[in-house]
């Protein structure tokens, strides 16, 4: 999970992709195909927009509380700015409240609830994280909401044996994941969920998930309140309840100790379930031990309250082996998914030989191929089945029964492992997939689109579209298309590092659905690809590099992307008007 490397510097990124040179792509043509031209709104000479001294890592959001579209930008130094959607000019801005003498890091994408922006950020003293905080901005009033005092997160959980405890430790906790909102009965504001891993893999660290009761948070500030104060932090999940993390290597993930960080940028995923909701929590590398309730490198399904029961068969799992878990055991788990190869799959074989004679789970840990780097997507099938599609940093994609997570229907390796003996992987810790799939339906068949990347010059990468089909009543993956096509030399030049997250839209009711993504380079490129056939229908070079793992915002036929100027490291939002041209 060596995630910090590209958050605050683009230098490593351009080492990886700077050798690829310029790439020319032609807009694909077919009968009655829409083509799209992207006209820059800002920054331009007329609308220079605004730039920021630090990166924009969180995804931009849309605010309509002022009766006009404003683009909310959360800068990593704690500035929250509202930009005019047409000109890029600052309508208003505010700073995250921070103790005097300390600095701010704001990485997680905030969440909007009823014209209130909830932000999660961390405060540093001389470079050391001292606290993690939540604050609320009243978007209508353009100010901090005084009814929500700044909330400093803290927690302490017992180990499984009940003898020791684990405290939430700010210096080794880091908030990468987007804040998530969920409803609560008889509550206007519901719950907010804040997830943590670490900025790298330095121990001791764990995965933490905080459940924040928004009504209780506000009630605790009411001077007229007569009844006892409620608990704002209503519940906390700890993924690896170990009080000791005895590692001998620089990074604990390789030894499968502690860890289990919740760090995927899209955050835990929340879906309706009966009369409530369920939360799917993907975790990163670390320790997995069912008896000790350690759940690194898994997907956990939880309900409100965050009380977790894996619901695995106790007899089948009595002698659980973290390196070679019994297939019958892990298939028995209702609320826990543990990744594994299919019986006929070829073992992972990095060219370095680092995984020779290693089990699959051991290889994932050694190579830093977290399952939890990506977020799952839930899809309802025509036959009534619901499935999860979960990518992994190792280049594979899992197809899982969403009601019984232990059931793995399929696994498909959609991109090769980075590097060869003569073409060393530039940044092997990145893996080959960090994303969240987007999905749609074509002719009643579910389609998922998954971005891949490879930091070498040998293996093709790009967006991969898969159909989910039924074979003998069982869901399976079926390859649909890949952009660029693997036979195209561009497939060896594009997508050499983390791209943006993908997003889907259609420009009119009669138009085809398009998936949009930003490939990062000295000057990044927006690509629009038609989902029904994988045809390239739009391409636009950015003024800046773009921003890895940020989701483009599309509103009213405008697309807004976070970007950074490599020469100055100034961050900005770039905006383009999507215009349709019929052939």
Language-model features, listed with the residues they occupy:
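Intrinsic disorder/low-complexity signature
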Residues: 3, 21-23
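Bacterial N-terminal signal peptides
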Residues: 9-20
């Amino acid at each position: 999970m060596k995630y910090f490397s590209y958050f605050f510097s683009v230098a490593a990124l351009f080492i990886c992709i700077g050798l690829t040179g310029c790439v020319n792509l032609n807009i694909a043509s077919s009968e009655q195909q829409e083509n799209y031209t992207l006209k820059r709104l800002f920054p331009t000479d007329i609308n220079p927009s605004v730039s920021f001294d630090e990166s924009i890592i969180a995804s931009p959001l849309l605010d309509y509380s002022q009766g006009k579209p404003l683009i909310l930008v959360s800068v990593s130094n704690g500035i929250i700015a509202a930009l005019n959607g047409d000109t890029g000019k600052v309508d208003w801005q505010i700073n995250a409240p921070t103790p005097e003498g300390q600095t701010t890091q704001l990485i997680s994408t905030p969440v909007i609830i009823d014209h209130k922006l909830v932000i999660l950020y961390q405060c540093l003293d001389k470079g050391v994280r001292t606290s993690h905080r939540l604050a609320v901005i009243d978007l209508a009033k353009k100010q901090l909401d005084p009814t929500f005092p700044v909330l400093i997160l803290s927690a302490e959980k017992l180990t499984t044996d009940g003898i020791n405890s684990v405290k939430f430790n700010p210096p080794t906790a880091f908030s990468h994941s987007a804040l998530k909102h969920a409803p609560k009965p008889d509550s206007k504001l519901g719950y907010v969920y804040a997830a943590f891993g670490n900025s790298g893999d330095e121990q001791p660290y764990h995965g933490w998930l905080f459940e924040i009761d928004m009504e209780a948070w506000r009630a605790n500030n009411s001077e007229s309140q007569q009844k006892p104060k409620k608990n704002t932090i209503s519940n906390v999940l700890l993924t690896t309840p170990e009080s000791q993390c005895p590692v001998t290597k620089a990074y604990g993930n390789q030894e499968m100790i502690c860890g289990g960080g919740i760090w995927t940028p899209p955050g835990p995923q929340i879906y309706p379930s009966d009369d409530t909701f369920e939360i799917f929590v993907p975790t990163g590398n670390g320790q997995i031990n069912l008896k000790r309730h350690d759940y690194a490198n898994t997907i956990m399904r939880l309900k409100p309250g965050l009380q977790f029961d894996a619901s695995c068969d106790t007899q089948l799992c009595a002698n659980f082996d973290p390196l070679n878990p019994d297939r019958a055991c892990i298939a028995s788990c209702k609320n826990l998914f543990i990744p594994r190869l299919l019986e006929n799959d070829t073992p992972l074989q990095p060219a370095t030989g680092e995984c020779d004679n290693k089990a699959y789970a051991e290889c994932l840990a050694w190579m830093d191929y977290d399952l939890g780097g990506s977020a799952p997507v839930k899809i309802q099938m025509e036959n009534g089945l619901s499935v999860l599609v979960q990518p992994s940093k190792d280049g594979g994609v899992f197809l899982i029964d969403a009601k019984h997570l232990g059931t793995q229907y399929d696994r498909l390796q959609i991109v090769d492992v980075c590097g060869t003996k003569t073409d060393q992987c530039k940044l092997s810790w990145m893996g080959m997939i960090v994303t969240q799939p987007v999905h749609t339906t074509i002719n009643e068949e579910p389609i998922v689109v998954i971005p891949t990347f490879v930091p070498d010059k040998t293996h093709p990468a790009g967006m991969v579209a898969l159909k989910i089909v039924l074979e003998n009543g069982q869901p399976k993956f079926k390859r649909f298309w890949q952009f660029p096509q693997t036979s195209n030399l561009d497939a060896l030049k594009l997508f050499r590092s983390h791209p943006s997250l993908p997003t889907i839209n259609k420009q009119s009711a009669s138009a085809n659905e398009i998936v949009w993504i930003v490939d990062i380079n000295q000057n990044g490129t927006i690509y629009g690809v038609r989902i029904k056939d994988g045809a390239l229908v739009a391409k636009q070079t950015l003024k800046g590099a773009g921003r890895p793992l940020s989701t483009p915002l599309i509103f009213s036929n405008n697309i807004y992307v976070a970007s950074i100027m490599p020469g100055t490291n100034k961050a900005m939002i770039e905006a383009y008007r999507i215009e349709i041209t019929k052939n």
